[in-house]
Design a protein with these regions (language model features):
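Carbohydrate transferase catalytic cores enriched for Leloir-type hexosyltransferases
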Residues: 1-151
């Protein structure tokens, strides 16, 4: 089954009107908004997380999926490559064949699948609260040091 999360109803309606989709309609599950407390369970049971967004300022869902050990397929645009690093398969979101190819590769290549899981789990560590706090602390110390040198 394919879970389509947090997509506007008008987009789902448009999707379901597509002739090509009639064969798989029974396999689509679109619950709408998903509460944050339910996200980890969904990520943990997912084969992969597809995030073909065209524009994002950061992309927290990418990190959430990675933290749960779920391989990520995401856009090669905007902030996604910087956030995902090697922890995701990057695709052009406007090229459905690239999405299909990425899904097929993850399905058929167990080593590649496991590497994506491992890369994701490693990548997400860079964004821990501890690392973020240490980075801010370093910036503040550098500013303080620079100001003390100027006075």
């Amino acid at each position: 089954p394919l879970l389509i999360a947090d997509l506007k109803e008008e987009y789902i309606d448009a999707l379901l009107r597509q002739e090509q989709i009639t064969e798989i309609k029974k396999q689509l599950f679109y619950p709408g908004y998903i509460d944050n407390q339910d996200l980890a369970a969904l990520y943990n049971t997912a084969f992969t997380f597809l995030y073909p967004s065209l524009r994002e300022s950061f992309g927290i869902p990418i990190l959430e999926a990675m933290a749960c050990g779920t391989p990520v397929i995401t856009s090669h645009t905007s902030a996604m490559p910087e956030v995902a690093g090697e922890g995701a398969v990057l695709i052009n979101p406007e090229q459905p064949q690239q999405i299909a190819d990425a899904l097929i590769k993850l399905e058929n290549d167990a080593d590649f699948y496991q590497k994506q899981v491992d890369y994701g789990l490693e990548r997400v560590k860079l964004f821990s609260w501890r690392n973020t706090a240490e980075a801010y602390s370093k910036i503040y110390r550098e500013i303080q040091k620079k100001q003390s040198l100027e006075t």
